[in-house]
Amino acid sequence: MRPWTGSWRWIMLILFAWGTLLFYIGGHLVRDNDHPDHSSRELSKILAKLERLKQQNEDLRRMAESLRIPEGPIDQGPAIGRVRVLEEQLVKAKEQIENYKKQTRNGLGKDHEILRRRIENGAKELWFFLQSELKKLKNLEGNELQRHADEFLLDLGHHERSIMTDLYYLSQTDGAGDWREKEAKDLTELVQRRITYLQNPKDCSKAKKLVCNINKGCGYGCQLHHVVYCFMIAYGTQRTLILESQNWRYATGGWETVFRPVSETCTDRSGISTGHWSGEVKDKNVQVVELPIVDSLHPRPPYLPLAVPEDLADRLVRVHGDPAVWWVSQFVKYLIRPQPWLEKEIEEATKKLGFKHPVIGVHVRRTDKVGTEAAFHPIEEYMVHVEEHFQLLARRMQVDKKRVYLATDDPSLLKEAKTKYPNYEFISDNSISWSAGLHNRYTENSLRGVILDIHFLSQADFLVCTFSSQVCRVAYEIMQTLHPDASANFHSLDDIYYFGGQNAHNQIAIYAHQPRTADEIPMEPGDIIGVAGNHWDGYSKGVNRKLGRTGLYPSYKVREKIETVKYPTYPEAEK
């Protein structure tokens, strides 16, 4: 009898018992569905812990397999070490299972409940405070009224920041933060594998292709979004994206001189048949399809924003506050992988500018947008939100300096900002502002500048800008790839987030609303509201699609309608 036979049987017995326990726990999860008062957050936490236990079970199985001793002479030294490691893993696993059993018996964690009650109490106290202060305002006049109103807003800000801070800590308690980090990472890696598979066919001569020309008549942010739109259609129709970028107005050498190629194996647009876009079904037998700009796209496929893949939707809703933005960001992430020289430029600029956290990014667009697509906004409008967020950050971290990364196409703004706000440290490169002017915009130096601005804006802890600007929206999209959920890390002075050429942006009414003025629209729960914009005053504007009426409605009375599309899942990417 070999000396390890007993150990092997013992290991297998424990693994079998552990597997049985996992099955038992799973059964309890199913039975617990009869109790709807369990929050979705707690369910997410339990599922994440179960996933970790399953992974450890698989790790132990592999370790046990490695302990099989071949016939013949046995070297006992390494085997003894492996058994000890296995024993330690089993002890840890047993502790985790016991902790899990305690949590399922005892309900939510202590920290979770303490924070939940604190938020509940904070909301009640805020209501008491509002009632009391507004009653006082009725009896005040002149300077006394102004003074009391200012103090009222100051105290109101403290209340709001207290609740927001507690909500942040609630989102991190009981392992929820760790789960969100892992889930976001797993989803990103999954999508990037699928894109990489699509973009690198084994035989380019036989691959179906979608051709996209980068030279749309607009600036860098707009052109990048044009390529993203092409990429999403290519992904949905299972075609390799061929990006034509020679004689690019920003860099005559093309996209690949700045960013990594979109494919390592297939950059040739040739094929046995070529045609212009006429719809996914009609183009089925055409090998090479040329895509127009989104403004001229007809028929429109379902793959346009703000739709997300059906197979990922449930996971995305759990992990991210704006799944549509996250989905767009995955294509941006793949496209802007820098060439080594650009990577070096970014590193050197980071050191030269002294870019460090905490820092808030501010983007001020002053040239071609103002007067046409956007209104003029003075620096004071931006800095109100900068100061508010620094006060919020100060409740969670040490704010040694209030740093602001200022990106603008107005070279005079940096001096103005430093003069008006001496207590802030403004980080900015005025040479980028000069290169962003209309006369210098389409040069390689200008391209370098806008790429650096977008990089630093995306790296900030919070973003204040106008979403009417493509640069601001690109920075916000990239920000989503750097955090599990950065959907709330912005304030736009004008538009809500949108993607040029997107399909309708709809919301669903969750509370009834009866208009109090002629500007408002009625709503009933379940009504579909086509949102036009948020006025950032508690009201949004949109159309009640059931009634055909357009007007204002309270923003809190609706939720986002998540649009899903049956995208291909590319199972070959997992092989």
Swiss-Prot record:
Effect of R337G: In CDGF1; drastic decrease of protein level in patient's fibroblasts and complete loss of total core fucosylated N-glycans in serum and fibroblasts compared to controls
Compartments where found: Golgi apparatus, Golgi stack membrane
Ranges per topology, Lumenal: 31-575
Signal peptide residues on this chain, from the entry's feature table: none
UniProt short sequence motif SH3-binding, positions renumbered to this chain: 299-305
Domain GT23: 206-493
Consequence of changing D368A: Loss of enzyme activity
Effect of D453A: Loss of enzyme activity
CDD domains referenced in this protein's UniProt entry, alphabetically: Fut8_like, SH3_Fut8
Catalytic activity, as annotated: N(4)-{beta-D-GlcNAc-(1->2)-alpha-D-Man-(1->3)-[beta-D-GlcNAc-(1->2)-alpha-D-Man-(1->6)]-beta-D-Man-(1->4)-beta-D-GlcNAc-(1->4)-beta-D-GlcNAc}-L-asparaginyl-[protein] + GDP-beta-L-fucose = an N(4)-{beta-D-GlcNAc-(1->2)-alpha-D-Man-(1->3)-[beta-D-GlcNAc-(1->2)-alpha-D-Man-(1->6)]-beta-D-Man-(1->4)-beta-D-GlcNAc-(1->4)-[alpha-L-Fuc-(1->6)]-beta-D-GlcNAc}-L-asparaginyl-[protein] + GDP + H(+)
GO cellular component: extracellular exosome; Golgi apparatus; Golgi cisterna membrane; Golgi membrane; membrane
Cytoplasmic-side segments: 1-9
Result of changing S469A: Loss of enzyme activity
UniProt GO BP: fibroblast migration; GDP-L-fucose metabolic process; in utero embryonic development; integrin-mediated signaling pathway; L-fucose catabolic process; N-glycan fucosylation; N-glycan processing; oligosaccharide biosynthetic process
Keyword list, A-Z: Congenital disorder of glycosylation, Disease variant, Disulfide bond, Glycosyltransferase, Golgi apparatus, Membrane, Phosphoprotein, SH3 domain, SH3-binding, Signal-anchor, Transferase, Transmembrane, Transmembrane helix
Membrane spanning stretches: 10-30
Sites bearing Phosphoserine, chain numbering: S278
GO MF annotations in UniProt: alpha-(1->6)-fucosyltransferase activity; glycoprotein 6-alpha-L-fucosyltransferase activity; SH3 domain binding
Pathway: Protein modification; protein glycosylation
Residue ranges occupied by any SH3 domain in the UniProt entry: 502-563
Disulfide bridges in this chain: C204-C266, C212-C230, C218-C222, C465-C472
Chain intervals for the UniProt region annotation (Important for donor substrate binding): 365-366
Post-translational modification: Tyrosine phosphorylated by PKDCC/VLK.
Family in the record: Belongs to the glycosyltransferase 23 family.
UniProt disease link: Congenital disorder of glycosylation with defective fucosylation 1: A form of congenital disorder of glycosylation, a genetically heterogeneous group of multisystem disorders caused by a defect in glycoprotein biosynthesis and characterized by under-glycosylated serum glycoproteins. Congenital disorders of glycosylation result in a wide variety of clinical features, such as defects in the nervous system development, psychomotor retardation, dysmorphic features, hypotonia, coagulation disorders, and immunodeficiency.
Name recorded for this polypeptide: Alpha-(1,6)-fucosyltransferase
Source organism (scientific name): Homo sapiens
Gene: FUT8
